[in-house]
């Protein structure tokens, strides 16, 4: 399986079976990270991390604080598509794979702040 990034039409295909989606909270300026795995044509959320805490950003029950980072395993069903509504008023998402993080718009080769969908392909 691979990961497809789409903004209207197919933009990019990445030969990965796991990735991290990261972003900075628009108000609190705190980094969030989600580790995803591609299995059976779906995206599985494996782990999430919050680098601190703030208003409306309380970690869920069962989260563990390690060196200032809250770690937890979200109990959510796998999804076919992950829709990202980018905004001109917030920083771009980052997509991390192969040991490197890059702005999502750079990876996809599209204009920054364009709405995007991630799905297995």
Residue ranges and their predicted role:
Residues 4, 8-59:
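N-terminal secretory signal peptides
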Residues 59-121:
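Mature, soluble, non-transmembrane domains
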